[in-house]
Amino acid sequence: MGNGERPPARRPDSSGSPPPAADAPAASNHPFSSHDTKHMTSRRLASRTAVAASLSALMLAACGGDDSANAPTAGGAAPLTPAVASPAGPTGSTPGSTPGATTAPAPSSTSAGQLSVDKMAFAQTHVVPSGGLSWTLPNASASLRPISRRDALVLVAIGQADAVQPVLEAWKDGAKLGALALSPPSALPPTESGGRAYANDRWSAVVPAAWMVPGVSFSVSASNYTSSVAQAPVFGTDADVQLTILPFYLFGADDTNSPPLSTTQAPDAATQQEIFAKWPTAELKVRTHPAGRFSLATVVVGPRADRTGAAQPAYPVTALDQQKDGYGVMSAMLTLITNMRTANGDGPLNDQYYAPLIALNSNGQFANLGGGLGGVGSGAAVGDHRYTGIFIHEQGHAFGLNHAGDEYAKGAYPYAGGSLSGSVWGYDPNHREFLDVLVPTTASSYAKCASSHQLDAQGRCYKQDPMQGGAGDQSSGYKFATFSDYNTGRMQAWIASRVLADPASSTGYSKWDSAAQARAPYTPTTDNNGLYGVNQNLPVQAGVPVHTIVVSFSKAGSAGASYIYPPFSYTGNLIATFDPTSAADRQAITVDKGTYPWYCKGTGCDYTLRVTYADGSRTYRVLQGGFRAWWTPTVYDANATNPLSGSSFRVWAINVPGDKRIGKIELLDTPMVWNGMPANPTVLLSR
């Protein structure tokens, strides 16, 4: 792009963080078992062992159906392709297709004596047809495909009622991978809370993850019929998701006066399995951040409105009840962890960050947080330590989901009021049961749901999506409500968009190619001439000792708002940054002329971090972004000194080499540093 072209849109706020969504969903108080490991754990679907160990035929109970009951009359959208025959709904419901969603038609060239397969679907997070689901809405589109490399319950509707001993066969490149005996419809698992059966005509088997890969096709044969026409599922990404937990103990909170680290540093094993059951990923890897707990005595809240709606300047907080609105501390911490995630090179990766906030009030008592915040699409969220409704909702924001009711009103969500009215059914492999789109009788919301939920023709309540007050719609024994198929498809899209650290790739990275249904080698590039960093802020050194330094700064001089946080030291990553004492580095970031001509063009490069190590050595790093007018890095923003404006406040996070102990951290005033480093810069802050 030429330097005279129109500048790209500015990111939403002065700290570079995505806009948070504030929430306080109801959260149940399920007890947690102790979980004190800091090592990464992985969760795959339950009930895999027997099938994965032997790919021979076996009988497995399952439940069937490839779409849901009771299609609503509102919220539909024009299909992407011509509609196919309406799939059968659950027993006792009116059959119908999902509004706005289309499925690929099954092959139909059955010959005499050949078994016919009317429907084939795969139950993972949801029951999804082999060709996937897709939606085109007035202001959004999405798709949901079977998840590659993840166990699935295959559901088959057979055209012949007299088929004897039907068998599912898996083929790839002309070779037979194996066969599985299909369990009869009478052996289907139940629906949650003893609810209505999903279908009465589906044969089933658990397909191992090794068969759920692009290029594999499935056919069904019987002892009295030849094999059906094969169906090759259209797969979604095979990427895993890493969930990184960063527990923050604030204002004197510790293990003696608050929930201990052993219960906050990661969800317990059962909760991890339920998270995996809800997220469309091939594998869930959960780790506690390598730094362990983060303890902070002070948090700086940026300019924002107080509880009355009056604008307030940035201010420091040393107890949770000092915040001037209910989300002040959460907002500050969301900005902090989002910037820390970027500084560690995790920004483009398939890594979700969650920070449980453990805080004390001014009386020294543990304080209930009462909600959470997630940066929409940022991969980061904050909330309480219980890992229930707040957690799953805020991580939904981190996946890029907004509030479903608002999106429905804007033509960006297909089901009325943010409900599941029209979604396909869900499936939970841990309980081995289907998840109805209707509120189950054991849900805490069941008794009074009619006043707040969408209703079917019989007056029964549809579930709400977790992104629209769905907490409480889940059956007893579950922590999380059921996402709609549409929102699950959007989460799958977020995962597919991520860069994957991939040792099998020639570049060390790969990305999912949806058209090819395969990973492709990915070479990091610098977008927008370095406006948001170099090589997408991926690591230039990985697995090395680092110090993470976080600085808040008020250009307006708000009392106590300019602050250097205690550094965090751990084994992490370093991204490309620049040393202003190096002429070559200054040339690289010179506005409109350097190697990265837009690195400083957005809002300037006017501040430098100087770190003096215990041995007297020093390192200097330019802090990208400041208080300049957008795209005019020589002129200050009109609100740069307005204490009530977010344009007067910034939070930077940067990793520096951590092989030596830090002696001093200083923030230096270095205006337009690409033009030259001052010989004796003014020290603005010191720690």
UniProtKB/Swiss-Prot annotation:
Its cofactor is Zn(2+). The keyword Transmembrane helix does not apply. Keywords: Hydrolase, Metal-binding, Metalloprotease, Protease, Zinc. SUPFAM superfamilies: Metalloproteases ('zincins'), catalytic domain. InterPro entries: Dictomallein, Peptidase_M66_dom. GO terms for molecular function: metal ion binding; metalloendopeptidase activity. The keyword Cytoplasm does not apply. Binds 1 zinc ion per subunit. Its EC number is 3.4.24.-. Coiled coil: none annotated. One of its GO terms (biological process) is proteolysis. Zn(2+) binds at residues 393, 397, 403. Residues 233-501 form the Peptidase M66 domain. Pfam families: Peptidase_M66. The active site is at 394. This is Dictomallein. It comes from Burkholderia mallei (strain ATCC 23344). The gene is dtmL.
